[in-house]
């Protein structure tokens, strides 16, 4: 038998192939217009698709349902029960915006609401995307769509860079200096700030670092020369760091997938291990809503 292992970046270029069986891991990554060409231009007798979470985009969901309707689902808590992954504990800790941050957040959030109303207030994301993709859209429609997306980015930036997250992060770290900790920030620059706040015990691992820098950070973390590895998205998937036993999440997104992936870094099975995950979030903000949604189907979640 011949087994070929290939990534989506290469698979979509294939044409005219016929496979007995195609297995797609992380299928949510293979559903874009470009990558789905593999399924259009090749044949297969059987198809198995796997993902930690179904895609949240309606179009991608429709594509996946046509390719491979869901026939089996297993939850993280069921995996813990079966001994597939280690037990976990998630603790959600609120932080407050400082005075000027709170003023800026309120101002931007009010503008966000204004632009959302201009878009009709119903599925504003889809409407804004439609407007910007339609050359016949009016100037007022384009202004509303651009304003909507701009305020989303501005609002998230205030949350991502909330100064009290660094203060709380340092406090948590110095109470857990014996742990091997993965830290996740919401933006690369803020991830660097988290890293610098406890230097020299941490190194950063994200897309702005060179391959040499990332390899060194990963190696020093594995050997124990540092006990904290700070990342943004680069460690969300594809890396197995079995000796990490604590995670501190300092940046939440609207996508539940990133939360599941980050938790996944900490629950890789290891005898006697309990994945300890601490999530810092800005209280009474959009971040709190995202976190509530991302953890709603998990059992062992503690809100402080």
Regions found by a protein language model. Give the residues of each.
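Conserved helicase ATPase core of P-loop NTP-dependent helicases/translocases
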Residues: 1-4, 180-184, 189-239, 258-260
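Inter-Walker segment of RecA-like/P-loop motor cores
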Residues: 1-16
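Structural recognition of the conserved hydrophobic beta-strand(s) that form the central parallel beta-sheet
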Residues: 4-7, 45-53, 228-231
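A short beta-strand element within the Helicase C-terminal
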Residues: 18-25, 228-230, 237-253, 258-261, ...
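Post-DEXD/H (motif II) to motif III coupling segment of the RecA-like Helicase ATP-binding lobe
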Residues: 28-89
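Catalytic P-loop NTPase motifs of RecA-like helicase/translocase cores
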Residues: 29-31, 56-57, 238, 256, ...
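Interdomain linker/hinge connecting the two RecA-like lobes of the SF2 helicase core
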Residues: 77-181, 185-186, 194-196
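Conserved segment of the helicase C-terminal RecA-like domain
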Residues: 265-294
């Amino acid at each position: 038998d011949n087994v070929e292992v290939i990534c989506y970046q290469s698979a979509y270029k294939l044409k005219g192939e016929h496979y007995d069986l195609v297995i797609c891991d992380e299928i949510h990554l293979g559903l874009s217009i470009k990558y789905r060409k593999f399924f259009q231009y090749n044949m297969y007798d059987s198809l198995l698709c796997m993902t930690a979470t179904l895609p949240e985009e309606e179009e991608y969901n429709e594509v996946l349902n046509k390719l491979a309707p869901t026939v089996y689902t297993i939850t993280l808590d069921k995996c813990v029960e079966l001994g597939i992954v280690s037990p976990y504990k998630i603790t959600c800790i609120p932080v407050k915006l400082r005075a000027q941050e709170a003023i800026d957040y309120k101002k931007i959030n009010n503008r966000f609401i204004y632009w959302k109303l201009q878009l009709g207030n119903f599925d504003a994301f889809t409407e804004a995307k439609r407007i910007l993709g339609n050359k016949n859209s009016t100037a007022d429609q384009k202004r509303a769509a651009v304003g909507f997306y701009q305020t989303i980015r501005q609002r998230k930036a205030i949350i991502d860079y909330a100064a009290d997250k660094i203060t709380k992060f340092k406090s948590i770290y110095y109470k857990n200096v014996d742990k091997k900790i993965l830290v996740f920030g919401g933006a690369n620059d803020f991830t660097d700030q988290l890293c610098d706040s406890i230097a020299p015990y941490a190194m950063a691992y994200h897309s702005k670092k060179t391959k040499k820098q990332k390899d060194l950070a990963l190696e020093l973390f594995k050997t124990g020369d540092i006990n904290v590895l700070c990342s943004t998205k680069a460690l969300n998937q594809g890396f197995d760091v079995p000796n990490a036993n604590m995670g501190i999440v300092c940046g939440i997104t609207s996508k539940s997938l990133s939360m599941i992936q980050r938790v996944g870094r900490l629950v890789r099975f290891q005898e006697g291990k309990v994945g300890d995950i601490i999530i810092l979030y800005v209280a009474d903000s959009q971040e709190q809503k995202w976190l509530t949604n991302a953890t709603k189907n998990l059992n062992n979640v503690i809100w402080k």
